[in-house]
Amino acid sequence: MIRFTLIALLALAGCTGKPDNIKPVTDFRPNEYLGTWYEIARIDHRFEKGLSQVTAEYSLRADGGIKVVNRGFDSKSGQWKQSIGKARFVEGKDKGYLKVSFFGPFYGAYIVFELDEPGYQYALVSGPDTSYFWLLSRTPIMDPALRERLLDTAVANGFKRED
């Protein structure tokens, strides 16, 4: 678990910028974004390599930030891995632009650039550049046609498809 957290930290350390063509959603409603999200697709990175059944749980912190609990199953070890972090808003709570830290003062960008309205049932998320991408859903299984449409949107925005 410590290795999972440290690799995530190192991969995102100091990377709070955003890709030029990616714009955070506006009129973001943090309280509606809270709760459990299921990872439907991603661009693989060392901190998630080999993990399946990945979830992200977001809850409100007393300081106004967001608690982040990422969890995934490592089939190689046969164990669940979990990493706990915190997120803060970069440009105000009404924009889907946050910075996330899993260790100390090191933050990485978390940019929600497409979000289901009004229900917040899916989200497209970028990191500091287009090598970081996640498709998240409120349910562990997504309608295949919707999944394809969202992945096409990601590709049109410069993300590489890995499935």
Set out the residue ranges of the language-model regions.
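Sec-dependent signal peptide recognition
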Residues: M1-A8
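A beta-rich soluble binding module of mature secreted/lumenal proteins
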Residues: C15-D163
